[in-house]
């Protein structure tokens, strides 16, 4: 069929390869696990069929689906009747599915359910073990791939909502061989660093195989033992892993996890403005209240304020005079000492030194006595001024109290209520207008009579003139 000396076009070569496959390889039965299942609008199903060592691309056309009574899913172990062929447009080897039937649950799904049941029985998923998020989150640890889109999505959300947070990335593989060990080591490093307020484990969506590292028991137990709150953000909303069950909080997506650990910047600014306005209003009200009290006090004791100012000024003058007197006395005695020291330098006898010492002691005693007298005089003056001020304030207060009492009595005697207590009454019409003449009212109109201890409500039946 093939001529080694002939130069083929790509399409001719693939046609011959496909014909060889279809002629030499008959239809056959295969058993494997469904993976990467997609169902486009055309109605055809595309998926991979795999075992532990290999996988092959499969197509189940729409017209071959009429006898299938179940809904194929990823991870399902199936038995298929296939025809091998070569898809000439891309040169891909593929299997055309003629018949499909389930064998039982797929190996990965079975392993998932077995580990899930085991950890449930041990209590690893119980709510009592879930750690709450701290009230204030400053540093966020992220376990993900540094080259993936997930970390960029998280950074974008954090910068938009709360750019003050610190992000510590603990780079790790998120799928494939060795990814479980990398993820576990990254989690332990983040938890033991003591720098993270919360840790997000994140990766994008994928098939069951792509997400399998997050279904391993080693990682699940590391999440359970961590002292830092853990948020799982693995795959899309429809993806579920063992890590989702054992973590403290499960977020539907990595972006949602970033929103969980940060406040909204605009909301914080709005709350800050509200708090500032409340504080400013409270401050203004308090200031206004104290100003009102101060004004009332000024009105009540205007004379006392003048007296206080007078005695305060007098005290200042006394203090100034005292300081000046002390300074002049010190200057005078320093001059005397300088004169004595000059004479001492000229004569330098021991008796002169003794004499100078005595003079110095006498001068110091005199100075001390003078200062004490001045202080006593000023203390007496200050005490007398203070007593005089107290008496003036008391006198003024009593005077105002007496005036207020007289005015209160006058108001009491002039009060209509006091008149009522002596047997009089006040009558008003329906409009609450006081009636002073019979011409102000008509037959059948309602009136109200105010007595000292209550009111009477009446209707006019008859009117007589005096």
From Swiss-Prot:
Give the highest taxon in the source lineage. Bacteria
Q: Where in the cell is it found?
A: Cytoplasm
Tell me which GO cellular component terms the UniProt record holds.
Answer: cytoplasm; exodeoxyribonuclease VII complex
Q: Does the keyword Disulfide bond apply?
A: no
Known function: Bidirectionally degrades single-stranded DNA into large acid-insoluble oligonucleotides, which are then degraded further into small acid-soluble oligonucleotides.
Binding partners and assembly: Heterooligomer composed of large and small subunits.
User: NCBIfam families from the entry?
Assistant: xseA
Q: What is this protein called?
A: Exodeoxyribonuclease 7 large subunit
Source organism (scientific name) = Ruthia magnifica subsp. Calyptogena magnifica
């Amino acid at each position: 069929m093939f001529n080694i000396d002939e130069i083929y076009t790509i399409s001719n070569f693939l046609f011959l390869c496909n014909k060889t496959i279809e002629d030499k390889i008959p239809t056959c039965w295969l058993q494997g696990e469904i993976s990467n299942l997609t169902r486009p609008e055309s109605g055809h199903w595309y998926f991979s069929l795999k075992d532990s060592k290999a996988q092959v691309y499969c197509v189940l056309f729409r017209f071959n689906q009429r006898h299938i009574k179940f809904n194929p899913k990823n991870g399902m172990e199936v038995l298929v009747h296939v025809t091998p062929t070569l898809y000439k447009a891309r040169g891909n080897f593929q299997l055309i599915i003629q018949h499909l039937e389930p064998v039982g649950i797929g190996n990965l799904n079975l392993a998932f359910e077995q580990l899930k049941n085991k950890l449930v029985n041990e209590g690893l998923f119980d709510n009592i073990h879930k750690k709450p998020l701290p009230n204030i989150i400053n540093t966020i640890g992220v376990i993900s791939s540094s080259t993936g889109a997930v970390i960029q999505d998280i950074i974008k959300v954090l910068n938009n909502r709360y750019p003050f947070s610190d992000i510590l990335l603990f780079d790790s593989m998120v799928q494939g061989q060795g990814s479980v060990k990398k993820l576990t080591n990254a989690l332990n490093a983040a938890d033991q660093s003591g720098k993270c307020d919360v840790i997000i484990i994140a990766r994008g969506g994928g098939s069951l195989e792509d997400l399998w590292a997050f279904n391993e028991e080693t990682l699940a137990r590391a999440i359970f033992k961590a002292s830092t709150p853990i948020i799982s953000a693995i795959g899309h909303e429809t993806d579920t892993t063992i890590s989702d069950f054992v973590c403290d909080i499960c977020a539907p997506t990595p972006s949602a996890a970033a929103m969980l650990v940060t406040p909204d910047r605009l909301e914080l600014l709005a709350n800050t403005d509200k708090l500032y306005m409340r504080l400013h209003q409270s401050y203004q009200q308090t200031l206004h209240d104290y100003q009102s009290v101060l004004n009332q006090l000024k009105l009540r004791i205007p004379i006392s304020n003048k007296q206080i100012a007078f005695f305060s000024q007098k005290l200042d003058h006394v203090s100034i005079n005292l300081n000046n007197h002390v300074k002049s006395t010190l200057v005078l005695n320093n001059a005397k000492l300088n004169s004595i020291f000059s004479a001492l330098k000229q004569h330098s006898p021991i008796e002169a030194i003794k004499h100078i010492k005595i003079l110095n002691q006498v001068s110091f005693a005199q100075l001390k006595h003078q200062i004490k007298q001045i202080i006593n005089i000023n203390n007496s003056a200050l005490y007398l001024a203070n007593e005089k001020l107290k008496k003036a304030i008391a006198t003024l207060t009593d005077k105002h109290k007496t005036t207020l009492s007289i005015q209160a009595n006058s108001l009491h005697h002039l009060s209509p209520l006091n008149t009522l207590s002596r047997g009089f009454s006040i009558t008003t019409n329906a409009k609450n207008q006081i009636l002073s003449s019979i011409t102000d009212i008509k037959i059948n109109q309602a009136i109200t009579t105010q007595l000292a201890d209550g009111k009477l409500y009446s209707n006019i039946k008859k009117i007589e003139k005096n």
